[in-house]
């Protein structure tokens, strides 16, 4: 890390420790005398620790490699993957596996990283899932990069930005669609920040499989294409090309469609509403904090419930349209009931 210390000294806030799992030979010797075959797993974590042991709590480390102890790395992401529907499914499996390994903050590359550009629909569905994930990011190898052999006959156009995808497919209106999802992400930041605080306080992954919270429900034991995002949201990404609806399992309790506010009873399978933008459901008795049009809003789901808003240091209890707020906040908050 000493080679990079000058960057911290001039105010760099964080580092992305790409790679970290590469060794050139099983027979190579590490400095402690172990061979490549013996030390290749530990090397991954040593590579990351060289930075994480030196940076301050205010700095961030974004890594892809890890071994035993990876749960202590600030942020991990899924690494380079191709732009296919199967890879998107694998990315979600990786996220849920990471959560069960104690990894709190996790990310992936919207639309994939390598190979031919994703279809418009794959990019859309990948973006939707990223909105409801701990870290939202897109990036890719540069045009004609190291994975160009995956693109025989291609012109090398590989940039995964929304505007390049729109340009490549001749669909300028796609930019407005992407602006909607990126704006929604910005509006959800208060809820995401709250979820991150809970993750740190309780060692509870932000994005996690349903079995993490509903361990007595046999229907969720092997469920690998839905997840919880924080304590309030259940997300069921659309995984197939041009898919607009899917089967969704809702655990015990009442659940509200995040986009339409329609209420569903839990402990059953439902068909998601094809008119909704994405199958996302909010658990009754919980809250969602958002910032819309510059206004701080807290949405109260269900006929009664309670929640603590950590950023404002207030406790909320409601029954019907009667609400009790304990604590003081300098924020002007608008409460909205979803019943």
Report the location of each language-model feature.
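Catalytic-domain carbohydrate-binding cleft regions of carbohydrate-active enzymes
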Residues: 1-277
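Accessory, solvent-exposed terminal regions and/or long lumenal/extracellular loops of proteins
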Residues: 277-339
């Amino acid at each position: 890390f000493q080679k990079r210390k000058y960057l911290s000294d001039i105010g760099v806030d964080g580092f992305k420790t790409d790679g970290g799992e590469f060794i050139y030979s099983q027979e190579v010797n590490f400095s402690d005398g172990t061979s490549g075959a013996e030390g290749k797993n530990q090397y991954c974590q040593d590579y990351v620790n060289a930075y994480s042991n030196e940076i301050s709590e205010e700095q961030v480390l974004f890594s892809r490699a890890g071994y035993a102890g990876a749960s202590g790395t600030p942020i991990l992401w899924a690494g380079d993957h191709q732009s296919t529907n199967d890879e998107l499914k694998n990315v979600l499996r990786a996220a849920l596996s990471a959560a069960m390994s104690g990894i709190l903050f996790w990310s992936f590359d919207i639309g994939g990283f390598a190979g031919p550009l994703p279809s418009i629909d794959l990019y859309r569905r990948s973006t939707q899932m990223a909105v409801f994930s701990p870290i939202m990011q897109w990036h890719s190898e540069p045009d004609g990069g190291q994975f160009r052999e995956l693109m025989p006959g291609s012109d090398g156009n590989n940039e995964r930005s929304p505007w390049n995808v729109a340009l490549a497919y001749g669909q300028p209106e796609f930019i407005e669609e992407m602006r909607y999802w990126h704006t929604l992400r910005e509006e959800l930041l208060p809820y995401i920040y709250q979820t991150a605080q809970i993750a740190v306080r309780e060692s509870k992954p932000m994005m996690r499989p349903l079995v993490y919270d509903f361990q007595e429900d046999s229907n969720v034991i092997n469920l690998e294409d839905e997840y919880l995002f924080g304590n309030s949201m259940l997300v069921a990404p659309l995984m197939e090309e041009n898919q607009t609806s899917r089967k969704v399992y809702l655990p015990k309790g009442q659940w509200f469609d995040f986009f339409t506010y329609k209420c569903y009873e839990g402990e059953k399978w439902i068909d998601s509403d094809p008119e909704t933008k994405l199958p996302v459901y909010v658990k009754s008795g919980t809250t969602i904090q958002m910032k819309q049009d510059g206004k701080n809003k807290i949405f109260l789901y269900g006929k009664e419930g309670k929640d603590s808003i950590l950023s404002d240091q207030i406790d909320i209890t409601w029954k019907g349209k009667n609400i009790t707020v304990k604590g003081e906040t300098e924020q002007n908050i608008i409460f909205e009931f979803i019943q």
